[in-house]
Amino acid sequence: MVWFPKINSDPDYHYDGIVSALKSAAEHLPRVDAVGVSSAGVYIDNRTMNASLFLQVPKDQFDAKVKDIYIRAITDTFGNVPYEVVNDGDVSALAGAMSLEDNNVLGIAMGTSEAVGYVDEEGKITGWLNELAFVPVDAAPTAMEDEWSGDIGCGVKYFSQDSVIKLAPRAGIELEESLSPAEKLKVVQGLMEQDDPRAAQIYESIGVYLAHTLVHYYNLYHYRHVLLLGRVMSGKGGDLLLDTCKKVLADEYPTVNEKIHLALPDEKFRRVGQSVAAASLPEIKE
C-alpha cells in the first residue's frame, strides 16, 4: 500500500492508511490473535504522545484523533484483541537481539526516518527515549534543517531515504520531482543493482557518515552489537554501505572497532524484521 504520512494533515487519511495496512497484513494470515505495531514516535500506554509521522496534523486534531489512532484502528478492525504499540527504534533493537541471539544491541533502521533503539545486557528494552533521528550528527552551519525538530544536522537527514535523495543530485543522478520519496529511493536502488558508480558514491558517503556517528553513539550506549535494518539497507547498496563503514572504523577508530560488531541480517529480515519483532510484543493470555 502507499501511505505518505509526513505530507498529509488530515488525521482521517492517517487512520484509513493504518486500517488498510492492518487489513492487508491480515489477508496473509489464517487469523489475527494479537497486533504488534512498530511506529516512529513516542508511545505511552499505546498512545501517540509525539511523532514526526503526523507533523502536519494540527494540534487540536492531533489530540482528538491521533493520540489514540492505533488503538482505534486495531479495535475497529479486529475487535477486542491484545495489542502493543512501541517505538520503531526499540523494535529494531529487539529484532537485532532476536536475529543475533545476543544482548547489548543497538538497532538502527534506515527508512522513512532513522529509528534507533537499544536492548541492554539483560535483553530488555529500556524505555529510554532513543530518538536519535533528532540528535545532531553534523555541526556544519550549512547542514540541512530538520523540518520537525527545527535543528540542523540531525541523524534523520543522514540515515534515512532523505539522505539518499539529498545526495543523488550531487552524485549526478537527477530524480523526477513527481516521485514520492520511497519511489526516488527505488530509482537509486535500481541503479545500484546495475553497479552504477554514481549510486555507489551515495552509499559510500552514508557509510562514512555512519562510521563517525557510531563512535558518538558508542560513547552513550557502550553497545556490543549494531544491527542495520530498513529499506535503505536493502540490496547491494546496504552491503556497500556496511563495508565502507567498517573500513572507516578500522582506519580511524581502531579501539572502538575492536569492541563492536556490525551486522546486516538477510535480505528478508532487513525489510520485515521489525514487523516480526513487533508481532512478538503483545501478551496473549490463555
Place the predicted regions along the sequence by residue.
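A mobile "lid/hinge" subdomain adjacent to the ATP/sugar-phosphate binding pocket shared
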Residues: W3, S9, S39-I44, D151-V208, ...
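Internal alpha/beta domain cores that form substrate/cofactor-binding pockets in large enzymes
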Residues: Q201-Y221, R231-E286
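Phosphate/pyrophosphate-binding loops at sites that engage ATP/ADP/AMP, CoA/4′-phosphopantetheine
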Residues: G17-V35, L214-V226
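Stable alpha-helical structural segments in soluble proteins, enriched in small hydrophobic residues
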Residues: A21, A25-L29, A93-G96, Q274-P282
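Glycine-rich phosphate-binding loop and adjoining helix at the ATP-binding site
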Residues: V2-V19, R31-V105, A140, G237-E252
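Glycine-rich phosphate-binding loop of actin/hexokinase-like ATP-binding domains
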Residues: M1, K59-D60, L94, S99-D162, ...
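Active-site metal-binding loops of divalent metal-dependent hydrolases
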Residues: G89, T112, V232
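Phosphate-binding glycine-rich/basic clefts of nucleotide- and phosphate-handling proteins
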Residues: Y15-S20, S24, P30-V32, E121, ...
